[in-house]
């Protein structure tokens, strides 16, 4: 079992969700986050004053998947989130030691 976590541009959420649904991913968690990397940020003008925007709005998507689905999930996210511009995001994969479905008590792969 693995967690696939991706940081993406907010306007790409629907495309990513559709791509994951197409490969059989049944659920995901989305969190609004802010951050920066190579993109660094930008400046904006508000009421005639220039402001430096260091942290850019992004979305963090997390999905719990069986190990055999990880590569397909990563490929689906990468293909659907890509714009070809700096700031497209990152994908991270890490292991789950134990999972429990609270409602039924099912554990590990049955809980996914």
From Swiss-Prot:
Q: Which residues carry this modification: O-UMP-tyrosine?
A: 51
- Look up keyword Transcription regulation and say if it applies: yes
Tell me, what's a Pfam family for it?
A: P-II
The Gene Ontology biological process terms listed for this entry are: nitrogen fixation; regulation of nitrogen utilization
Q: Which Gene3D superfamilies match?
A: 3.30.70.120
Chain segments annotated as transmembrane: none
Keyword Cytoplasm assigned: no
GO cellular component term, pick one: cytosol
For this UniProt entry, the molecular function terms from Gene Ontology, in alphabetical order, are:
ATP binding; enzyme regulator activity
**What keywords is this UniProt entry annotated with?**
Nitrogen fixation, Nucleotide-binding, Phosphoprotein, Transcription, Transcription regulation
State the function annotated in the UniProt record.
In nitrogen-limiting conditions, when the ratio of Gln to 2-ketoglutarate decreases, P-II is uridylylated to P-II-UMP. P-II-UMP allows the deadenylation of glutamine synthetase (GS), thus activating the enzyme. Conversely, in nitrogen excess P-II is deuridylated and promotes the adenylation of GS. P-II indirectly controls the transcription of the GS gene (glnA). P-II prevents NR-II-catalyzed conversion of NR-I to NR-I-phosphate, the transcriptional activator of glnA. When P-II is uridylylated to P-II-UMP, these events are reversed.
SUBUNIT field: Homotrimer.
The family assignment reads:
Belongs to the P(II) protein family.
Q: What is this protein called?
A: Nitrogen regulatory protein P-II
Q: Which organism is it from?
A: Rhizobium etli (strain ATCC 51251 / DSM 11541 / JCM 21823 / NBRC 15573 / CFN 42)
């Amino acid at each position: 079992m693995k967690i696939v976590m991706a940081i993406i541009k907010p306007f790409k959420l629907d495309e990513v969700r559709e791509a994951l649904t197409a490969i059989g991913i049944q659920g995901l968690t989305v969190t609004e986050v802010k951050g920066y990397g190579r993109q660094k940020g930008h400046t904006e003008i508000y009421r005639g004053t220039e402001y430096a925007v260091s942290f850019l709005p992004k979305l963090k998507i997390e999905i719990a998947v069986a190990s055999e689905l990880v590569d397909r999930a990563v490929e689906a996210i990468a293909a659907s989130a890509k714009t070809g511009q700096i700031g497209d995001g990152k994908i991270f994969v890490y292991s789950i030691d134990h999972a429990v479905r609270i409602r039924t008590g099912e554990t590990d792969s049955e809980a996914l």
